[in-house]
Amino acid sequence: MSKVGTSDSKNTLYCSFCGKSQHEVRKLIAGPTVFICDECVELCMDIIREENKSSLVKSRDGIPTPKEICKVLDDYVIGQNHAKKVLSVAVHNHYKRLNHQTKHSDVELAKSNILLIGPTGSGKTLLAQTLARILDVPFTMADATTLTEAGYVGEDVENIILKLLQAADYNVERAQRGIVYIDEIDKISRKSDNPSITRDVSGEGVQQALLKIMEGTVASVPPQGGRKHPQQEFLQVDTTNILFICGGAFSGLEKIISARGRSTSIGFAAQVLAPEDRRTGEIFRHVEPEDLLKYGLIPEFVGRLPVVATLEDLDENSLKKILTEPKNALVKQYQRLFEMENIELTFADEALGAVARKAIERKTGARGLRSILESILLETMFDLPGLEGVEEVVISREVVEGTARPLYIYADRSDRAVESSASA
């Protein structure tokens, strides 16, 4: 049994779980007869999160409830509540539909594939990746920009089903109940409204190829990839019950929506007259199928995506939360890097706000946060390994704005705060 240990000479306290001394950890929390360090507390929290994730509350059909799916999404994805609700309900209904079909074959429910529309860095891909972690079904992601029509250089559409089959360990039955996320779907829009003698093999051609597998067909899938092994036997995979989620930034779609608003006399026209004064995500809320057609998606393809969820631009508060709250938050990652040098990295709240505002100004969303932090911390990370006695580095708003340098706090408190290399 682990005992609370104290050094005979210095009365040093030790963690009752890992045995580290109070000098090796940041915090040592005292109980009636035991001590626990901050590292063990964090480890316990990780274990509890994993157990909660794996024990989702089930509905009567044995399917995770929409609220439970949404709750787990909340743990990883900041904001985008509407999109999370749409995804949670769609995934729940998808598997409820499959169970319903097996019990009542006389009633056939149509499949509702999903289209996610949102600005760059708003969380479309992260939502799909998080779904993969919380659902016990095969899941795969595909990049629409790599797809071409069969017979041309690039990936065949059937390769998407092959990846799903691989995710299911070649269990065809499981693969037929999986989920496919196709990213950058806006990049396969038709290049021109006018028919051309030049075949559009990566735009409209890919849309045509995707139609059948999205609606439901028996696809012949080569287990090793068809182009390199043409003589192999094909596996037959029915795509009727595979849920397809497509996502894209649809850059320029907001102009089409705004133009439609200016040409109509209905009430919401006044709301879109000045798109430069509004954020892209707000304009996306008013998207209609006709806007997607003008953007370059063919009518049949739009019809295969009946559920449209729009994501909003992330505001300053959401970006600040993204920096600090998720399990793998960027600030936590950089703090871990500094811990390897036995240095504590501290961000002032105003500094986090300044980082968020920079990302908003650049219109890069959450995707641009890492590059901003990297540029702020570059000189510090360059200097620190060669310095001795630095205990803490403090990042203020002025540091982010470029008007000051990070503060170095030394172990010798008589010279408590020293500006970085500028004062050296």
Curated annotation (Swiss-Prot):
Under CDD domains, the record lists:
RecA-like_ClpX
One cellular-component annotation, GO = HslUV protease complex
Positions of Zn(2+) binding: C15, C18, C37, C40
UniProt entry keywords in alphabetical sequence: ATP-binding, Chaperone, Metal-binding, Nucleotide-binding, Zinc
Please name the GO terms of the biological process aspect recorded for this protein, alphabetically. Answer: cell division; proteolysis involved in protein catabolic process
Chain sites annotated for binding ATP: P119, T120, G121, S122, G123, K124, T125, L126
Any Pfam family? ClpB_D2-small
- ClpX-type ZB domain location is 3-56
Q: Which residues form the signal peptide?
A: none
SUPFAM superfamilies tied to this protein: Glucocorticoid receptor-like (DNA-binding domain), P-loop containing nucleoside triphosphate hydrolases
Q: Which GO terms describe its molecular function?
A: ATP binding; ATP hydrolysis activity; ATP-dependent protein folding chaperone; protein dimerization activity; unfolded protein binding; zinc ion binding
Main function? ATP-dependent specificity component of the Clp protease. It directs the protease to specific substrates. Can perform chaperone functions in the absence of ClpP.
Spell out the family assignment given in the record's similarity comment.
Belongs to the ClpX chaperone family.
Q: How does it assemble?
A: Component of the ClpX-ClpP complex. Forms a hexameric ring that, in the presence of ATP, binds to fourteen ClpP subunits assembled into a disk-like structure with a central cavity, resembling the structure of eukaryotic proteasomes.
Q: List, alphabetically, the HAMAP family matched.
A: ClpX
What protein does this entry describe? ATP-dependent Clp protease ATP-binding subunit ClpX
Species for this entry: Bradyrhizobium sp. (strain BTAi1 / ATCC BAA-1182)
Q: Which gene encodes it?
A: clpX
